[in-house]
Amino acid sequence: MDASQADRKVAPVSAVVKNAICELSRINDGERLMEVLLSLKCYLGTRENSTQTQEHAEFNRNHYTPFLEFLVAQMGPQWLDLLTLEKLELWDSFFLEGPADQAFLVLMDSLGKTGPSIRLDRCVHVLERFLQRGALAEVIREVCQQQLESNPTAVLHEAILGRISSLPDHLANCLQQHNKPVFYPNNYYPLLAGSIISVLQMVSDALRDGKNCSISFASQVVGKVCMQGRQKELLSVLVPRLKSLVQSDCIWQRICWRLVESVPDRWMEPVVIGIVQMAPGAEFLSQLLGDLVVKNKRTQFLLTKKMLFLQYGLKKDALQSILGYLSLDASRRYLLVKILRELLEVWSSGSVLKNSSQPQLLHVSRCLLICLGLLNKQEIESCKQDLLVSLTSGARNYLDSSVPAIRRMGMVVAECLSHRIDTEGPGLSFQYEEDEDTRDLKALLKPPHVFEADSADCVKNPEESSPSKSCPKAIEKSKMEAKADQASDSELDSDDDLAPYDMSADTELKKSKAPAYIRDCIEVLLSDDVEKLEVTMTCLATLIQANTSATKEVSVELTKILLHIDDKPSVERFTELRHAALVAVAVTDPVPVSQYLTGEFYSLNYSLRQRMDILDVLSSAAQSLSEKLSHEVSSESRSTGTGQHSIRSTTWTLAEAPADWRKVVEERIASKTRRFSKGQSVPTPVPAPNRYHAVAGHLFFPLIQNYDRQIVTFDLLGEDRLVLGRMVHTLGILMHLALHAPIASQMGKALLEFVWVLRFHIDAFVRQGLLFCISTVLLSVPWERLMTDMAEEVMETQSWLADVAERDSDDDCRRLALNGLFLMEKLRNNIHGTP
């Protein structure tokens, strides 16, 4: 009896739909078409009695999707002629007023099966209206409700998830150049984020009414969209909206926790990374994630391992958010201590330092300093032994680095570590030039907000540390003093209105006179008179250039004295003046001086500073020798033999220099000559010999010969790799300046052999110098000579460059290797392109 009654109740719906489809498939009258559609429209929407509700549910469950597919299939030129604008609105309403999930699937599937036609245009129009009216929120909400059922249709939900997450890609493939703006990723994903917020708002209202809800499908949508690389478009709208909602509402806070917790593990990484990058601070990150880092092993791995140790692209704000989030709750602080120990181990490792690039080391240093700033005294005390061990080994490794930026970074971190270990002691202190990076590193010790767990340690005495209370008093006092000064000034006479004489450029007069002879300078350099020494060092380089013949007599002796003289802090710019004097001597008498310097470079009992000074002098002297001589007559040829006159000749200014009479005559002739057309005048280059070419071998070959000889106090292939790196760069400079020199090919062959021996050096600074040397050889030695005299070396070098460009851990090494490969290819093409 009950079964037959059920059949009678269900039969009318299926019969009506079947008859309507049969009639619509062969209809030719527009009015009748509208009547048939209206007869089926009654099954959409809510009904008043239970019978109509059952019919409505039956239609939605069994007949809605097939009927929509039939409507799409029938849409063509014939139906378009029968349907007016009002009738087309009725056709659209079947998609816009029925179950949103089924309508969305039918529209998306129809787009994939339909080519350019009226049917495609109509489906696109309906889908555009579907999105603009916010129906995506209804799709997500209906799927969320279906997941509460005992037997949810997982295949259907997976299909809807794929269509929602990749809708812009599907529409771009279907419409190509005729795509609509609403389907663009930059417009669609913010719209999707708004729909997710609407769904969460419905869930919030339902929870307040005591209803059971699920948001797992919304989490899946967020996860899959982020997995496809659209975190920025989605989360840039979703995260700020959630931030404003979770501030004072505990229900919204729990919804946010569940939203992130329900993301599948395979999509958790892009979601967490996107939230960390978008989160405005640690407090909001804690409100959004809760204790997810403790509950979910995947999230814990991401936040405590991968994002801190395996990646280095996060900005410092994101790092502060991650570590600050771990410090905000007692249940998570043990992870912060664990991270600190692991960071100390990584930072102090010599292997990590050698095989990591500067951005990676900067990332580790930032994480370490942020952790130090977030830990309290008790936690620091528990890690004190680890801090001491890491400080000792790490500081030594960083100080041995040949890269100045890395060495400076290690000094900053070592200083901060020592001060945190013993806040009352003196701590470590290094001398280095502060730049923006060092200031940023030091600022990381102070968290952006004072957290509850370590407030007692971060701020010892707010009244003393805060300048806000003392500033108003100081400002008021300065104002009173300014008023008093102004009143006293008004009482003075009018003579004080005159502008004071500018004495900013005045210099202090020295009692000692500048020496006039080179030998007098040597005596002063050997004495202990600081004032005479300062005067002598100021004019020594100029005096050497003015008295070349006298300088050549004592060039080696003067070089020896300047090389061994101790730094004089009391003499202003002493290091710069000493370097200028050494360069002037080397330029004046290059062969003996270069032989002495290159010989002393490998001698005993020289400090690293002296050896590096030798390299600087050689490179600067080679640069000066390769430049053209001035067209002015030399000071020594103008001198009459008196010392005072030679001194005067070296201090001529440009205005006092005698004018070139030929140039004056040519200008007068040009001014009195009338020309109807005149091109741009180009001065004729004056040929001049390159003084460096004649002495290049004396600077280059002695320096490259004994690099593998180990001395008790000097080991280039061992611990003194900083000097080795500087020497390699100096050799590259000497090679580059030898362009067009007869000896360039011999220098290039020797330098290629030198590079081949050291190509696998562990220090990145040395490898950078070797790659620089390769480029200088390619630029200085003609390609024909390279392929004739050293073809085998060039081929081996090319394969090595390709390997470095692909596998080297240092970014600069890879860049230099690519430059070398491009240069080789360009030189080869130039040769092949010539007739």
From Swiss-Prot:
Q: Where is this region: Disordered?
A: 455-501, 629-648
Per its record, what are the GO molecular function terms?
Hsp90 protein binding; telomeric DNA binding
Sequence ranges of Basic and acidic residues compositional bias: 474-486
Q: Which Gene Ontology cellular-component terms appear in the entry?
A: chromosome, telomeric region; cytosol; membrane; nucleus
- The answer, when asked if Cytoplasm is one of the entry's keywords, is yes
Localization, UniProt: Cytoplasm; Membrane; Nucleus; Chromosome, Telomere
- Is Transferase among the key words of this record? no
Compositionally skewed regions (Polar residues) per UniProt: 636-648
- Listed as disulfide-bonded, the cysteine pairs are none
Where does the protein principally reside?
A: cytoplasm
Q: Where is the composition biased (Low complexity)?
A: 464-473
Which UniProt keywords are listed? Chromosome, Cytoplasm, Membrane, Nucleus, Telomere
InterPro entries, per database record: ARM-type_fold, TEL2_C_sf, TEL2_Regulation, Telomere_length_regulation_dom
Bias type Acidic residues, positions:
488-499
- GO BP term (any one): 'de novo' cotranslational protein folding
The record, for Gene3D superfamilies, names: Telomere length regulation protein 2, C-terminal domain
Q: What does this protein do?
A: Regulator of the DNA damage response (DDR). Part of the TTT complex that is required to stabilize protein levels of the phosphatidylinositol 3-kinase-related protein kinase (PIKK) family proteins. Promotes assembly, stabilizes and maintains the activity of TORC complexes, which regulate cell growth and survival in response to nutrient and hormonal signals. May be involved in telomere length regulation.
Q: Which family does it belong to?
A: Belongs to the TEL2 family.
> What is the protein name for this chain?
Telomere length regulation protein TEL2 homolog
Lineage, uppermost ranks = Eukaryota, Metazoa, Chordata, Craniata, Vertebrata
Q: Which gene encodes it?
A: telo2
